[in-house]
């Protein structure tokens, strides 16, 4: 779960009290990746990727630890693509607050994203900094409010609502830059398709996806934010309470809302990208726990995902797909592996630099409703 405004500190593990709301959607494509016909490309719109590692670092299959980045030692897991002769598309999946990195990679209800390596994707899974390089750490260490100017603990994904967050208004933070460095290093050992670099995640991982795309749209080809936050603010960047953020989006559901998920102000232009936003339906909510053990609603993923879809859909070089289902605040539960492959195949059908006008959305798996553009009908 992600939180938006932290005026009062409570616990679930520990939790920041108020949130800017969220609403998102889910997207994918039924076409087989190898059979997909890429859209007309504009390679000039992309920047070349430099495959390089920190001095002396060597990548291996499986868990990689002690990766030096911005004064920290980070970890990531590599599942090389199978049955691919040329450069493979890349999938960088992220867990949220409660489940571990290995859950997200191997447990069915958490996405089991490692299976995508069997379908031709090189899967590179970053381990959260809060987990101290241990991919088995769950919410006992990572679920709760952030520190040092960050709103939420699992990922460095949104600036705090108090003055400490000011530092991150136009600084991407150590996770967004780590993901880029990680992929660049993996590319020294495995052939990677520089025009098909994708990332995505659930909850805080979805929020982190939004942040990475907003700060690094020159690197990523696209992303899959599932129930991610936008941390909606007022137009001048002033943080809003949970209730005020919900009300702001409800009052103007088609507006481009500023948010603490990205730089302030939001970029005038991003892309080229393909972004698929997933909203888990009416049950895509999160309850936090007060110190006395009582529960209260602290996250609603309708308004934040609406806000994210509005921004990306308004960008001329971005294809945005809005998808909805009924699984609530979880990794998509209906036909999970079919959804995962369909979503990644949809992303891969639109390599970086492709003409958005050439994009064709295919039928999603049963249980999902998707369309090109922002969410409609949520308000």
UniProtKB/Swiss-Prot annotation:
Q: Which UniProt keywords apply?
A: Hydrolase, Signal
Q: What is its EC number?
A: 3.7.1.7
Give the EC class as a word: hydrolase
- Active-site residues from the entry: 203, 309
Signal sequence span is: 1-23
Q: Which domain of life is it from?
A: Bacteria
Single GO molecular-function term? Answer: beta-diketone hydrolase activity
Catalytic activity annotation: nonane-4,6-dione + H2O = pentan-2-one + butanoate + H(+)
Q: Which residue stretches, if any, does this entry annotate as coiled coil?
A: none
The free-text function statement in the UniProt record for this protein reads: Catalyzes the hydrolysis of 4,6-nonanedione, a beta-diketone compound. Also mediates hydrolysis of oxidized polyvinyl alcohol (PVA) in the second step in the degradation of polyvinyl alcohol. Not active toward the monoketone structure.
Q: Which family does the record assign?
A: Belongs to the peptidase S9A family.
Query: Oligomeric state and partners?
Result: Monomer.
User: What is the protein's given name?
Assistant: Oxidized polyvinyl alcohol hydrolase
Primary gene name: pvaB
